[in-house]
């Protein structure tokens, strides 16, 4: 179970569930449940279209020719995985994701990242993936029949505290996708791994935690609405719009992770269009004052 009473607020409550395991004498429905769980975990909850599914590997698994571990391997070494996570990312980001997808945790130190970086450069991507799946850690936690899952939110022998805090930088909520985060393709942990430091726990964005998708030290929180005064009527409501990546010729080019604007609900649609024209990305919308 999650190790904190703030599990629901931090977004870890959804992970308080039994691992998905394929047992003996399984049905076809049981196999499909495992297949869905593998896609969700190994592909970082990214959407998989019907045309992208690994039908050959699914068939081998459903008919008992390969184990859960081998199906995980097939997905992680597939062209689908490479297109989603390898080709468009720096290798440090790829290694972060491999740890999360295959071992269910974040890297503990820079030495782990260097080890996998060397293996990737000298032996190739498939060999590096095999090193996760064939490791003693994978065998001890998942064996041949359990789908990998996020382990950083539970107390286990051999766990380090840094894994708990760092997972909040990699896992941005149960419904979030690893390819749909505000930080994009940037490494989440490279800086703190190099410094041997740990990041503060930052909960996922939500109605009450909208500003939390960036660490507070890097954020800029202006106390004004978008375009000046809100122009409220007596019964109008103001919402808080959190925006990243604003970039226009008339907008100040200052290194800020995000900005917050306060907008009346009656003008929200208009302002969202304006934000889009300014190149911004909306991170969250929540009632003002929360």
Curated annotation (Swiss-Prot):
Pfam families, sorted = CpcD, PBS_linker_poly
Which GO BP terms apply? photosynthesis
Task: From the Swiss-Prot or TrEMBL record, state where the protein is found.
Answer: Cellular thylakoid membrane
Q: From what superkingdom does this record's organism come?
A: Bacteria
InterPro entries given for it?
A: CpcD-like_dom, PBS_linker_dom, PBS_linker_sf, Phycobilisome
- Report membrane topology: Peripheral membrane protein
List residues of the PBS-linker domain.
1-179
Q: What family is reported?
A: Belongs to the phycobilisome linker protein family.
Alphabetized, the UniProt keywords read: Antenna complex, Membrane, Photosynthesis, Phycobilisome, Thylakoid
UniProt domain CpcD-like: residue ranges: 236-288
This entry carries the following GO cellular component terms, namely: phycobilisome; plasma membrane-derived thylakoid membrane
State what this protein does.
Rod linker protein, associated with phycocyanin. Linker polypeptides determine the state of aggregation and the location of the disk-shaped phycobiliprotein units within the phycobilisome and modulate their spectroscopic properties in order to mediate a directed and optimal energy transfer.
The name this protein goes by in its record: Phycobilisome 32.3 kDa linker polypeptide, phycocyanin-associated, rod
């Amino acid at each position: 179970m999650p190790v904190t009473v703030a599990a629901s607020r931090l977004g870890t409550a959804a992970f308080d569930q039994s691992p998905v395991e394929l047992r003996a004498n399984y049905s076809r429905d049981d196999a499909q449940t495992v297949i869905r769980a593998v896609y969700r975990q190994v592909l970082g909850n990214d959407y998989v279209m019907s045309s992208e599914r690994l039908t050959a590997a699914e068939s081998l698994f459903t008919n008992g020719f390969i184990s859960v571990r081998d199906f995980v391997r097939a997905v992680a070494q597939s062209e689908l995985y490479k297109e989603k996570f390898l080709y468009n990312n720096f290798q440090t980001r790829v290694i972060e994701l491999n740890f999360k997808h295959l071992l269910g945790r974040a890297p503990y130190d820079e030495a782990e990242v260097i080890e996998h970086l060397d293996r990737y450069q000298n032996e190739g991507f498939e060999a590096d993936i095999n090193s996760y799946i064939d490791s003693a850690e994978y065998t001890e936690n998942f064996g041949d029949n359990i789908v990998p899952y996020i382990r950083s939110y539970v107390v286990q022998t051999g766990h380090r505290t840094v894994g708990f805090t760092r997972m909040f930088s990699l896992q941005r909520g149960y419904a979030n996708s690893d390819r749909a985060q505000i930080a994009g393709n940037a490494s989440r942990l490279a800086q703190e791994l190099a410094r041997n430091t740990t990041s503060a726990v930052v909960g996922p964005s939500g109605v009450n935690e909208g500003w939390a998708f960036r660490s507070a030290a890097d954020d800029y929180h202006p106390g004004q609405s978008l375009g000046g005064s809100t122009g409220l009527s007596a019964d109008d409501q103001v919402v808080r719009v959190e925006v990243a990546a604003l970039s226009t010729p008339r907008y100040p080019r200052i290194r800020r992770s995000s900005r917050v604007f306060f907008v009346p609900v009656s003008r929200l649609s208009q302002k969202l269009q304006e934000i889009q024209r300014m190149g911004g990305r909306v991170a969250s919308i929540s009632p003002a004052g929360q």
